[in-house]
Amino acid sequence: MGSGDLNMKKSWHPQRSGNVAATQKAEAEAIAERKKLQQRLQEIEEERRKEEIQKALEAAGGKRKIDRVEWMYSGPTDGQAGDSAETEAYLLGKRRIDKLLQDNDTKKALSKQSQQDVLSAAGPAPVVTNARDVATKIREDPLLAIKRQEQQAYEAMMNDPIKRRQLLASMGIDDSQIAAKGGKEQRRHKHRSHHHRSDRHRDRDDDRDRDSARDRDRDRHSRRRRSDSRDRSRSRSPRRRSDSEEDRSKQRRRDSPDRTRRRDRDQSRSRGNRDRDDDRSRRHRFPQGRSRSRSGSPGGRSSRRREYSRERDSGGPSSRRDDRNSRDQNRPRRDYAKEDEQPKYDGGLNKGGRRQQQPDGDHKNAEEERAKKLAAMQAAATDLDKAREERLKALAEAERAEREADEKARQQNKKFRGGDAGFMSGLHSRAADMKIADRMNGRV
């Protein structure tokens, strides 16, 4: 047996490989910690120098630095600017609790005094005049963001009918009452606006009628005055006739072209309104043929005579009507006879969507033809029903006869052949009579 040191087998021996590795690891960690601490102390020293330089610049009249979020990184002084040595004591582990308890009152007094000194030295707070900074502060305001989220949630809930109904029910408000109230307000607003529009149209029509009546009276008075002056000029000398003509020319020159155009436009509009009302009332009162024949009555002739005299005096629509008639004469005529030879049924409606008026004879013929077609369709349907019933009866009779024959065959089999035993004996006898070729072919 060889000799050896038994202490090498102990777990506490420093030369064991495990203990050596643990020692090296602990030493490396201590060295890394000292390096980090030294680096942090250098950073603190650099920050302190920068602060001193900034304070010196501010004291010399330089630009003041605005503190925004620096208070978050000011250190373990509860938001107060304490001593730098006290700040570094946390890192070095040299800060003692007994000293803090003893100097608590003194620190409070010093902190209040330092706050007052800082406020008095700083003066008024700097005013932020940059619009971008103001917009950024408003956009990043947490309270504003919370309010905006609440508003969005409320709008989403009001847009959802189920949640809206639940909210109104919790508040004790009926949704149907709100909807009915809104519908009443909308109908009242529409009714009020309709009344306003009808009143405006009525006032405009009344003004137009008054203007047209005033123009008619002026035209009648001017015609009467011209006729009187013409009668007087016949009985007077040629000199007086020339004087009257000069007066009439002056009177005509006195009427401005704008007034003449306005009078012609009002007259044509009033005549169009009267003609349209007369045509509408005539269509409601009489058929198409009778209303067309009534236009040749003496009253119609007298009204046309009055309109012709008025148009001749005004000199407006007659020339336009002549031009329109000349254009209609030059336009090629449609051959309605060829169109009648090829009738097309459009459901009784013309291009305007109104039902065309047919003569009584054609209407009666169409009704008779429709009645004949309906009778033929009903007769064909009746014949089809009868044929179907007969076919169903024949099928039922055939099924009944087949059931009776089957029942009769069963009764005979039971009576003469003994039922199932007779059936099996018949099968055996038939199998015995079969040849081998029939058996090979599978015949029974």
Swiss-Prot record:
Gene Ontology annotations for the cellular component aspect, listed alphabetically: U2-type spliceosomal complex
Record SMART domains: Cir_N
Biased amino acid composition, Basic residues: 186-199, 282-293
GO terms classed as biological process: mRNA splicing, via spliceosome
Subunit structure: Associated with the spliceosome.
Similarity field: Belongs to the CWC25 family.
Name of this protein: Pre-mRNA-splicing factor cwc25
Organism: Neurospora crassa (strain ATCC 24698 / 74-OR23-1A / CBS 708.71 / DSM 1257 / FGSC 987)
This protein's encoding gene: msp-6
